[in-house]
Regions:
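12-transmembrane solute porter fold
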Residues: 38-63, 70-89, 94-96, 100-108, ...
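Membrane-embedded alpha-helical segments in integral membrane proteins
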Residues: 56, 60, 64, 117-122, ...
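Cytosolic juxtamembrane N-terminal segment immediately preceding the first transmembrane helix
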Residues: 1-54, 68
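Membrane-interface helix caps and helix-loop-helix hairpins in membrane proteins
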Residues: 128, 219-224, 247-253, 379-380
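Cytoplasmic helix-loop-helix junction between adjacent transmembrane helices
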Residues: 137-171
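Peri-membrane helix termini and adjoining interfacial loops of integral membrane proteins
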Residues: 18-22, 207, 446-455
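C-terminal membrane-cytosol helix-exit motif in multi-pass small-molecule transporters
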Residues: 201-220, 235-247, 263-278, 478-486
Length: 489
């Protein structure tokens, strides 16, 4: 809305507007005024996205402390990671629909409030179940904020500035994994794991304030029909599948686990069938029939799942296997995070010049070397060797992931762009959750098999190697998939 002085000046300096053009002119005027400082307008969303990625990458280093305080197993503690990613994966497909029903500003503030409440609950909870409940609330908030940020960028910035705006958003998101493990380690060393959630709460309040003051709703609410059956099926299907895989580490091949897996697979099969037959599906899964999208999307998913699995195991191995405290473990992971951010920034420019295939293969080879170095880590390994393995691995991953992601989205027709991005992000989060759960199962199985006659530290190192082998297999799969991809010039 225009202020009183602005309305007065408008009346004095403009000619009468024809009635049929009044609404359009008013809308254009509002847009010009509102979007005069687009980065300031987006500040709350930038903070929210940073917070979501910081939360996703900083919790791994706190898992040993949670196990010690609550007396839980590694398999139970993994839910702090898996539950968060599962919540994101379930919410993501629904955000596009929510933005058409609820004003973007309202939706983002609600999402950030969910994150704030979740952070406070996790920080203050005396029992693990409530810590996990707060963590899942944080995942819901992140799952809404991330796609909302990119949707707002497409409408707030003029076409000539969208590339630069996406670059700013990318830098914000890349900065979080760089400092996440190190910051979490420092907070645990100085205070406790609860300080991590206290920090999340403070940043949440800042993001809410910036959104309330600066953000406007750039997305029109059209209120299309909601296919409730699809929404429910996606929640049940993804939830049962990830829960079933995650419970294997503690319950084995029990009836509950098998039942969850069967229900998850059947419901997801129904979900896919329904999306393919609806006139207005929740997600247009016909995109998966495009080889130019599906092959690089699978490469992205494999590399993302590998990264999460290895980054889930590595900080725990530093503490439980090599005997470092949380602060030292966080500092040892800083170099790899910095290198990853730098390479992520450069991978996009190299993609424009060389295409996806050579970069994916180069990245896969580097990641394979890094994974093999991880396999060579033992109880007496010097810190410098771990840093070397981590740095080599983290150099390779962005060349794989960024290049394959660009290739997947580049060849999509314009009308598939939004669904393609959502499908890709959903695949990453859900498969990442499953991959982390599988890595946990392998970690615990290897730990149990190698404990006889070994110290607890050696047993954890033995179990970690099983998880690293799983990550190595995923990288090899991504490398083989690169031979099926055809570049689009």
């Amino acid at each position: 809305m225009l202020s009183a002085s602005q309305r007065s000046q408008s009346v004095q300096t403009t000619q009468p507007i024809p009635p049929e053009n009044a609404a359009a002119a008013q809308s254009v005027s509002a847009c010009e005024r509102r979007f005069e400082h687009p980065h300031r307008l987006m500040l709350g969303l930038y903070l929210g996205a940073f917070l979501g990625m910081l939360s996703e990458t900083s919790m791994n280093i706190a898992l040993p402390a949670l196990c010690d305080e609550f007396g839980i197993t590694t398999g139970t503690a993994q839910w702090m990671v898996v539950g968060y990613m599962l919540a994101i994966g379930i919410v993501l497909p629904c955000v596009g629909l929510l933005l058409k029903w609820v004003k973007a500003k309202t939706l983002v503030i609600v999402a950030l409030c969910c994150f704030l409440v979740g952070a406070v609950v996790s920080a203050a909870s005396p029992v693990f179940a409530l810590v996990l409940a707060g963590r899942i609330l944080q995942g819901v908030g992140t799952g809404i904020v991330l796609p909302s940020m990119y949707a707002a960028i497409m409408r707030v910035f003029p076409p000539a500035q969208i590339g630069a705006a996406n670059g700013v958003a990318g830098l914000v998101i890349m900065f979080a994994p760089v400092i996440g493990p190190t910051l979490a380690g420092l907070l645990i060393g100085m205070f406790s794991w609860r300080a991590i959630f206290a920090l999340f709460a403070v940043v949440s309040v800042a993001a809410i304030a910036c959104t309330a003051v600066f953000f406007v709703t750039p997305i029109e609410t059209t209120r299309p029909r909601i296919d409730v059956i699809s929404v429910v099926a996606s929640v049940i299907g993804f939830g049962c599948l990830v829960a079933g895989v995650s419970l294997v580490s503690d319950m084995g091949a029990s009836g509950v686990v098998i039942g969850l897996l069967v229900v998850g697979v059947l419901v997801l099969a129904f979900y896919v069938w329904r999306q393919l037959h609806l006139e207005s599906p929740l997600l247009d899964l016909k995109i998966l029939g495009l080889r130019s999208f599906t092959v690089p999307a699978l490469m992205v998913t494999c590399s993302f799942a590998c990264t999460l699995a290895i980054m889930y195991i590595a900080p725990q191995e530093l503490q439980r296997g090599l005997g470092f405290d949380a602060t030292t473990a966080g500092l040892l992971m800083l170099a790899g995070g910095v290198v990853n951010a730098i390479c992520s920034f450069g991978a996009g420019r190299l993609f424009d010049r060389f295409g996806a295939v050579p970069l994916v293969r180069l990245g896969a080879l580097l990641a394979i070397v890094g994974s093999v170095l991880f396999l060579m880590i033992g109880v007496g390994t010097v810190p410098a060797f771990f840093v070397l393995a981590h740095v080599v691995f983290m150099i390779g991953i962005p060349f794989m992931q960024q290049s394959a992601q660009s290739a997947a989205l580049k060849g999509l027709p314009h009308h598939f762009a939004a669904d393609g991005s959502t499908i890709l992000n959903t695949m990453q989060q859900v498969v990442g959750a499953v991959g982390t759960a599988i890595a946990t199962c392998l970690l615990m199985a290897g730990q149990a098999a190698g404990t006889a006659g070994e110290s607890a530290a050696q047993g954890f190192v033995t179990g970690s190697r099983h998880g690293y082998i799983f990550g190595l297999v995923l990288i090899v799969i991504a490398l083989l998939l690169s031979f099926l991809h055809r570049e689009q010039r």
